[in-house]
């Protein structure tokens, strides 16, 4: 069994080949580096392989020279629960377009098999792709539309399920686990990694943003429908197809009260940047159970570089403090980008952050970009 870590590439026909004699590399920040065995895990069965147009694969030759390979770089797109350690090593053509927002992960040949530069960080089988996109999904969407006629949220998440294959959306129709209730067409940040809205000159977004404002009654109808029967039921505001949910605080708060007037089952969650503290307070006071906060840095400079928001990191901290003080379970969705979060100044800032705000959980999430997209230095 070979101990060599070998680079791979894709030829002009899309065939994936190993680059004999070229050591496999990964990318952190804007630097290509050699991969080590401890960086690698076997490629998960449910992972996908994706070519990077106009990005040449890069490896290290036997004489130690880092050089491009005459073929396209290949990336692994990992299922939920995995966190990439390195991006694919590549050389970008000057005329290359920005790539769509996916968690591009280095993949190589090791022990005569495909391995990727990642770690398994979230042991939750519920997000395994095997549970989604089943042959009966289309009929389940039709059933729910008949049971909740005229509800625009159902129409929205039905499209998200069938067109964009969103797992959280699909759970509404499977009547289980966590389902999303999108509510806000607007946002108070301009994230580099926004998956629902990007400027025309940027990379294409992998989802379409909601174009309407659901009423409290529409919100409650979906919430009650789901929580009454779903095992481990959760309804979540703040989905990939919307902006910032706290900006819809009036309708969300009213919807939560209507839900809780009918059932105390399940959990009500919000995924949020929590930058608008007044909106967060209204939703917390209405009966929010849990709050997942999207965040990339505990330093103002690092935070602003990504979110480009109309609020400040201190507003985020104030919202988290209010939620913790009012018994809400708070977790962080920590956006991880190789070469950024692992810098010394970032780690030091997180130590201070957690001393001040002892949240209950940290979940690492991949930031969907390649290195040239985020300007942080």
Segments and roles (model prediction):
Residues 1-94, 100:
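Short Lys/Arg-enriched alpha/beta "domain-start" segment
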Residues 187, 191-194, 237:
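Short cysteine clusters
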Residues 114, 227, 260, 284, ...:
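N-terminal cationic-hydrophobic initiation segments that often serve targeting/anchoring roles
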Residues 97, 102-181, 198-206, 218, ...:
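N-terminal [4Fe-4S]-dependent radical SAM core
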Residues 375-377:
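C-terminal helical cap(s) of enzyme catalytic domains, especially alpha/beta-barrels
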Residues 3-6, 16-19, 112-122, 273-275:
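Short, well-ordered strand-loop elements centered on a beta-strand within folded domains, enriched
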Residues 178, 182, 198-279, 286-316, ...:
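Core AdoMet radical
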Residues 314-373:
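Conserved C-terminal portion of the radical SAM core fold
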């Amino acid at each position: 069994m070979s101990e060599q870590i070998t680079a791979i590439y894709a030829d002009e026909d899309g065939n994936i080949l190993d680059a004999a004699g070229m050591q496999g590399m990964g990318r952190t920040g804007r630097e290509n580096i050699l991969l080590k065995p401890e960086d690698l895990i076997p490629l998960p069965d449910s992972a996908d392989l994706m070519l990077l147009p106009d990005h040449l694969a890069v490896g290290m030759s036997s004489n130690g020279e880092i050089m491009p390979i005459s073929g396209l770089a290949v990336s692994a797109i990992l299922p939920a629960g995995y966190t990439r350690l390195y991006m694919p090593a590549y050389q970008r053509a000057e005329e290359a377009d920005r790539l769509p927002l996916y968690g591009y992960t280095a993949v190589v040949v090791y022990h005569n098999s495909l391995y990727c530069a990642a770690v398994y960080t979230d042991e939750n089988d519920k997000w395994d792709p095997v549970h989604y996109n089943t042959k009966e999904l289309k009929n389940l969407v039709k059933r729910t539309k008949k049971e909740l006629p005229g509800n625009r949220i159902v129409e929205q998440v039905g499209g998200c399920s069938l067109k964009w294959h969103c797992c959280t959306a699909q759970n509404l129709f499977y009547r289980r686990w966590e389902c999303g209730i999108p509510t806000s067409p607007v946002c108070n940040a301009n994230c580099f990694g926004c998956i629902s809205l990007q400027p025309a000159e940027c990379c294409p977004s992998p989802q379409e943003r909601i174009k309407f404002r659901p009423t409290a009654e529409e919100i409650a109808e979906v919430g009650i429908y789901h929580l009454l029967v779903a095992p481990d039921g959760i309804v979540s505001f703040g989905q990939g197809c919307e902006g910032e949910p706290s900006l819809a605080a009036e309708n969300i708060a009213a919807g939560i009260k209507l839900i809780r007037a009918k059932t105390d089952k399940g959990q009500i969650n919000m995924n949020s940047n929590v930058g608008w503290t007044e909106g967060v307070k209204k939703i917390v006071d209405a009966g929010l159970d849990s709050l997942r906060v999207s965040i990339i840095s505990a330093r103002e400079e690092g935070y602003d570089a990504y979110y480009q928001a109309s609020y400040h990191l201190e507003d985020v901290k104030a919202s988290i403090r209010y939620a913790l003080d009012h018994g809400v379970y708070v977790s962080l969705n920590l956006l991880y980008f190789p070469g950024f979060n692992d810098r010394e100044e970032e780690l030091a800032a997180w130590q201070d952050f957690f001393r001040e705000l002892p949240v209950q959980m940290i979940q690492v999430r991949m930031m969907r970009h390649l290195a040239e997209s985020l300007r942080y230095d």
